[in-house]
A protein has these predicted regions:
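Hydrophobic face of amphipathic alpha-helices that form TPR/SEL1-like repeat modules
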Residues: 1-64
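Surface-exposed loop/turn and secondary-structure junction residues enriched for glycine/proline
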Residues: 13, 42-44, 49, 67-70, ...
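Glycine-rich loop-to-alpha-helix module at the N-terminal edge of alpha/beta enzyme cores
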Residues: 60-152
């Protein structure tokens, strides 16, 4: 049985354990900075010569990552790929779709410090702000998964008589 929705609690960085968890995540993420990321369309990686960089706003010389830029043709390919996948996805039951959201929320919850660390580097969030953004993302997945289940269930039909 699914528990009632409850907002993801914020991390209390006054505790040694929380500070250490965040410090370790920052070290881990720092080791991953500077990678190059291709486009991914229809599950296939596409490398382009036209690249752009994401930099740490607090340290503009620190490159977070380099990513392939898409063309109009790439956008068209992505729309076609999404349309093709939709033909299958639209038949996936709401409970299965909701389960994807719940599993993603659980994964993000387990890796909360890591996701927050990426926000610290990529957009110069403070630890508290980054933690709040990650908690909000978890809340969105939990809430909309529950809404999906609620809306997929039989709904009462309300008849009203309007007298003119």
């Amino acid at each position: 049985m699914l528990m009632p929705f409850r907002n993801e609690p914020f991390t209390n960085f006054e505790t040694d354990a929380a500070r250490e968890g965040m410090r370790l995540a920052l070290e881990q993420v720092k080791q991953e900075l500077g990678r190059t990321y291709p486009l991914v369309i229809g599950g296939k990686q596409i490398h382009t010569d036209d690249l752009s960089q994401s930099v740490n706003p607090a340290r503009p010389d620190e490159i977070i990552g380099t990513f392939a830029k898409a063309t109009t043709e790439h956008a068209d390919q992505a729309v076609r790929a999404a349309h093709w996948v939709f033909d299958e996805w639209r038949h996936v039951p709401a409970a299965e779709r909701a389960n994807y959201l719940f599993r993603a929320a659980a994964s993000m919850r387990r890796r909360k410090y890591e996701f927050a660390a990426w926000l610290v580097y990529e957009v110069s969030k403070s630890w508290v702000e980054a933690d709040a953004d990650v908690a909000e993302a978890i809340d969105f997945m939990e809430y909309y998964g529950r809404e999906m289940l609620r809306l997929a269930a039989p709904q009462p039909v309300v008849l009203s008589l309007i007298h003119i």
